Amino acid sequence: KLYIQFAKNFGKLANYPRLKGLNKKYPQITVVQRKESDKGPSFGEQFHTDSIYTKKPPRFTMLLSKLVPKKGKANTEFCSQYYAFKDLTKSMKRKLLSLKGVYSSEGPISVTTKERVKEKGKKIKELKSTHKIIRKISSNYAIYSSPGHLVGFQPKIKNSIDLKKKLFKHQ
């Protein structure tokens, strides 16, 4: 209850679109769990932007850990996408400013999410959306992309795999 009250200080709460919430009383709380039987990358293991595959992704998400694995097993890291944009070459900035990313809930990061969906998910089809890769927020530009969900670019470009690799390495 306190967690929900705290979260409401930042804005309207949203439900995670792929999994059922904790219970009927707290549908906005999603249990993020790694099981011994899971294969592939852990739920959210790679750098990503939460729910980027929705038309209007949440402005923020919060984590509260009940069980913390040993160091190196579940580290949460943060990075500034403002600085990431500033550090791009001029030619890369121009290229990315002209593109939108196509994002999918079935992207490469979705292995464990698919396992959770089978267990206690919502029956929904693939979610896809398109967003500018570079966003202007206030007076600053920032990279807005998610390696685990990016499946293409608009307009389509040659060597998109190379561009994805460069972008993700930079982020």
Name each region found by the language model.
Residues 1-171:
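Non-heme Fe(II) oxygenase catalytic core, chiefly the N-lobe of the double-stranded beta-helix
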